[in-house]
From Swiss-Prot:
Pfam families assigned: Ets
Cross-link (Glycyl lysine isopeptide (Lys-Gly) (interchain with G-Cter in SUMO2)): 92, 165
Gene3D superfamilies referenced in this protein's UniProt entry, alphabetically: Winged helix-like DNA-binding domain superfamily/Winged helix DNA-binding domain (1.10.10.10)
GO BP terms, alphabetized: angiogenesis; cell differentiation; negative regulation of transcription by RNA polymerase II; positive regulation of transcription by RNA polymerase II; regulation of transcription by RNA polymerase II; signal transduction; wound healing
Motif (CTBP-binding motif): 273-277
DNA-binding span(s): 5-85
Keywords from the UniProt entry: Activator, DNA-binding, Isopeptide bond, Nucleus, Phosphoprotein, Repressor, Transcription, Transcription regulation, Ubl conjugation
InterPro entries with a match to the protein in the record: Ets_dom, ETS_fam, WH-like_DNA-bd_sf, WH_DNA-bd_sf
Protein known as: ETS domain-containing protein Elk-3
């Protein structure tokens, strides 16, 4: 016998051979057979396959392989009884073709017998089986759950974030408005009264530079309002003493030579030129009389007392001096009755008593004589000579104040 024979072929040969009727026999005409001596049949199968330890248990497990191939099946309720499924066709078929084409033949027969509804149900069953296997694969842990979550639920999370970002700007908008109001307040659009800081310096040279800086640091906006009024200044007015203690005849020691500066802030709509004189103050006759302000409304800075005998030059960028970026700028000019304080937006172009000035040799720091002519650089319409009388005398303090009161 051939060694390449299969188990079902081996059993079929035993049934067809009359010598082995005491081991295996047919029980019916439809292909049922019974193993009369199952252990002997198993030993014969072991001899064919060169397996000496073959027994019925191993033989029965080998027969189960043909259950799936639908070649042999076990008869239920009968021990050692089996049946060939396609009998007697199996006797006429090629043994090699039986195992290869048996499964395909069974599928074709089932398709022919099944109705169209059954076919559709079979297809749906296959689709459900595929989806079930996919879900089992996803939840088995072999597939990353992070990737599944990121693919299934990202749009909702992004929408929530976008709505939160759209709701946040209205809540933050009030602080932005508050910052804008602060900026408007700094630019003095709504503030009517501004107090000017006052700096006290020990030497006369620093005092001269400080007074010049304070006199020249006024904003261009206030100066533009005061330019029309500056043209209507007259030069005839009587002198009147403002303070008895500051009269030119009052003697003072040399170390107490001082310059008193009194600055009062006015509204931007009611500003007018100021007259300055040594020890006296007058009001221009061309200007209408102005009522005296109450004491509660007067905002004046403490006087700046500057002592010394020598008037020199000082750098305007000293940290002791106030910044002039947001302060008005006034300029002094000579009138027959005294010194007139006129506005001028020359904050960054005027050089006071510096070596860069074209009239530096004529500065009071180098010419100490009385009635020294001192010229500033080009002003509104030309050069304005300003005499500074009695700078070297001991009893000639100057009081600079606003014309808020009548002389």
């Amino acid at each position: 016998m051939e060694s390449a024979i299969t188990l079902w072929q081996f059993l079929l040969q035993l049934l067809l051979d009359q010598k082995h009727e005491h081991l295996i026999c047919w029980t019916s005409n439809d292909g049922e057979f019974k193993l009369l001596k199952a252990e002997e049949v198993a030993k014969l199968w072991g001899l064919r396959k060169n397996k000496t330890n073959m027994n019925y248990d191993k033989l029965s497990r080998a027969l189960r392989y043909y259950y799936d191939k639908n070649i042999i099946k076990k008869v239920i309720g009968q021990k050692f009884v089996y049946k060939f499924v396609s009998f007697p066709e199996i006797l006429k078929m090629d043994p090699h073709a039986v195992e290869i084409s048996r499964e395909s033949l069974l599928l074709q027969d089932s398709d022919c017998k099944a109705s169209p509804e059954g076919r559709e149900a079979h297809k749906h069953g296959l689709a459900a089986l595929r989806s079930t296997s996919r879900n089992e694969y996803i939840h088995s842990g072999l597939y990353s759950s992070f990737t599944i979550n990121s693919l299934q639920n990202p749009p909702d999370a992004f929408k929530a974030i976008k709505t939160e970002k759209l709701e946040e700007p209205p809540e933050d908008s009030p602080p932005v408005e508050e910052v804008r109001t602060v900026i408007r307040f700094v630019t003095n659009k709504t503030d009517k009264h501004v107090t000017r800081p006052v700096v006290s310096l020990p030497s006369t040279s620093e005092a001269a530079a400080a007074s010049a800086f304070l006199a020249s640091s006024v904003s261009a906006k206030i100066s533009s309002l005061m330019l029309p009024n500056a043209a209507s200044i007259s030069s005839a007015s009587p002198f009147s003493s403002r303070s008895p203690s500051l009269s030119p005849n009052s003697p003072l020691p040399s170390e107490h030579r001082s310059l008193f500066l009194e600055a009062a802030c006015h509204d931007s709509d009611s500003l007018e030129p100021l007259n300055l004189s040594s020890g006296s103050k007058t009001k221009s006759p061309s200007l209408p009389p102005k009522a005296k302000k109450p004491k509660g409304l007067e905002i004046s800075a403490p006087p700046l007392v500057l002592s010394g005998t020598d008037i020199g030059s000082i750098a305007l960028n000293s940290p002791a001096l106030p910044s002039g970026s947001l302060t008005p700028a006034f300029f002094t000019a000579q009138t027959p009755n005294g010194l007139l304080l006129t506005p001028s937006p020359l904050l960054s172009s005027i050089h006071f008593w510096s070596s860069l000035s074209p009239v530096a040799p004529l500065s009071p720091a180098r010419l100490q004589g009385p009635s020294t002519l001192f010229q500033f650089p080009t002003l509104l319409n030309g050069h304005m000579p300003v005499p500074i009388p009695s700078l070297d005398r001991a009893a000639s303090p100057v009081l600079l104040s606003s014309n808020s009161q009548k002389s």
